[in-house]
Structures are given as structure tokens and as C-alpha cells.
Amino acid sequence: ELPVPENAYTCVAAGDRLAFGIYAPGDAAPDEENDDLYQYSAVQIQERDGTVVYRNDHAAVLSVALSNGDASAPTDWLEIDTYSDDGSSIEQTSLLNATTGEERSGFVVYLSAGVASFQSENGTYQLVDLTSTGQSEVLCEFEDPISAYAPGVAVTYRQDLGDYELHDLNTGDVLEVRDESLGTNTLAVYAKDGTLRVYDQNTGAVLTDTVVTPIEGLQRTDLYNVDGGWVWLRQYDNDDYEATTRTVCGPNGTNKTLDLDAIKARYGADFHGYLWPVTAAGGEFYFSVSYQGPGRNWLYDLIDSTGNVVLAGLGSCNGYYAANPLPDGVFVARKGFEIGWMDLHGQWVYCQNIFYSSGDDAENYYF
């Protein structure tokens, strides 16, 4: 049995030590204990035998690894939010290494691969390696906020211009970026010169490297990182929500722009305009198209990136949670009175009747 401080309301394992959030330190009057959690909250780190090695009143604690859901995040670093005496505002956010005792102030955000962003006292933004031996190490420094990182590259956000820059940390080259998108351990960027790349955020490997020429009169883009090196780029030459072109790019040089006119012609007035990436398999990407069928009911077709219909007349057709993806070529679908996971041949991998219900089952958006 491990010793637990009185009034502890949370506990985080950090290396071989335990960090506790403690409610109502001794300076809180009994009738004030419920007024403000952060006014009467402290962080205490201790050995497993109960020996206290760190204490910070008016503070809250978070695990960097758990709060980011990143398996590569170091587990011995903790985020410490220190509040003002009245608990109304955060005075300082720092990262504390519970093992070594190192505390670094100015924490902004954890990025990936053991690297976080900090703001220095002079206002610059630093890439800091939290996994370096002995003590954290500043890798480089920028004038603008750092929005994303993969080993070998960093993306900064130019606040005055509202766009981004991709920095090659090995060569010093800088690429002006129109849009960026983060997936599950992947970073996608679309540059103003048409370069489109996807990086693995754990290794820095380039998963996709191609060119999509910007359309004439381009006003804005939407870039969707759908993981595995696949990206879905929509370009607009207007201020409306109607995309001018929609391009899918992926590993092995895949670069296809869907023929929207042909798709609209196939469905006519019943076409809803909904076109969304669903799954990838065998070097091909698949999308769902929504349209109104008999009785004005919504139906969905699964099409490939050439526009060919693979499966038709589904009651629903969409992807799954990015953090818990289905196998390649499997997606969430409804057909008739069955709902579940379907493959590209229309066969159920798993399904259940839509009328199935049990009070013991946890409710979920899909099942």
C-alpha cells in the first residue's frame, strides 16, 4: 500500500515517483474550501515511500504523455499550471521532470517525438528535446509560434500573415506553406508552390511527396490528413462552401483530382454534394457520396478516387475514429437493418441489427 496525501483528488505516475493534486491546503479556511478548486489546490510529488520531493501551492498537474495520448511522449515530464493567489488566472505554465527535478518555464504545447514548444523570456519560441540525456536541450529558436514538428522539420505560424512556414532543420531551407493538417502521428503540409508532403511525426520519414498545382484565382484551401500518408485537398476559387477541385494524394505517388462534373451528372438533382474520405487499401482511396433515393431517403455510394462506384445504396458510409482506426479497406456502414463494419466487397466484418439494444451496453456513436 502506497502512502497518499490527505485530500488528494488526483494521482499521476511520473517515472518512479507519484504526483498528487491535493485539495484545500492548510491556508484555506473550512468555509472556503469549496469556493475555488485552483485557489485551494496544490501539487505534491513524492517517492513511493511517501518522501516529499516537490511541492507547489496554488497549482494543478497533468501528465504530458496522458494528456496528449502520444505513446512517444516521455512519461516522467509533468505539466505544472501555477495559479494566482486568488485562483483566477494561470501565472505560469512549466514542465517538470519528476525524475531529475528539472523545471522549464514557458511551456506552450507538446508537439511529437519527445519534443515540445516553449516561449522564452525574450518572446522567441523554442523547440526543446525532452528526451536528451541529463537535461532538456533547445534544438532551435523561431520568432513565430511553432505549430507542428516532425524529426528534421518544424512548422511555424506567421501571425501577421495568417499562413505558415516549413523549416528544414538540417539544411535551413524554408518553404512558404498555405495549409497544414495533423493526423495520427503524421504531419501534412501544402505549400504555396504546390508541394504537398506528409511526414511521419515519430521518425521524420516522408510518406508522401507530390505536387498539386494551385488553381487559378485560388482563395483558400482545406487540407485533411487522413493518416497513412493519405491527404484530401480541396481548393476554392470563391468564398462559398463549394470546392472548385478535390484531390486525393497518397503513398507511391498517388495524385488524383476527382471529376466533380461527372459525379454531379451521374446523380443529377439528387446529389447532395457530400463527398468524404472513408478508407484506403491497396494504393487506392475510397470516398462516400450522399444523394437522395426513393422516398427522399438519404443513400450513400462508396466510390474510388477515379469516381467509379464500388458499393451502392448504403444507408450510411463513413470512417471511424482516427485514434482507433479500422483495418485498411474496412469502414462503418449501414445496409438494410444491419449496421457494422463492412469491407470493400460489401461483406460484413462485424454487424448487428439496428434494433438491437441492451441497457448493459455502453452507448457509443456507432455501437
Regions found by a protein language model. Give the residues of each.
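Residue-level detector of conserved, function-critical positions
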Residues: 1-367
